[in-house]
Amino acid sequence: MKATFYLLLTLFAIKLNAQVGINTQTPETTFDVVGKPNDTSHYDGIIPPRITGDQLANKFYTQSKKGAVVFATAPASNLSGQVINISEVGMYYFDGNV
């Protein structure tokens, strides 16, 4: 029992760094997505989280969320704070400034 515990503790203590690749065995960056341009049955692209401006207003983004990308499906009702610029449907990113 003790040996199993130490084995599991050792396995979970090992820190792994990896690159993630989608449709590739050799990712070139931290997150590498390779499309299938010649396969018409697959749609290429990345879809970010879809959320309304009002739903986004209920969340509090800090500097650690800088660079976050969302697709606003509706503008915010009250254009203030972190949703001051969410005035129409579209892709938005958080640059750390409110």
Feature-to-residue mapping (PLM):
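Hydrophobic, helix-prone linear segments
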Residues: 1-12
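C-terminal trimerization/auto-chaperone modules of long, extracellular attachment fibers and adhesins
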Residues: 2-4, 19-98
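N-terminal signal peptide c-region/cleavage motif recognized by signal peptidases
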Residues: 13-17
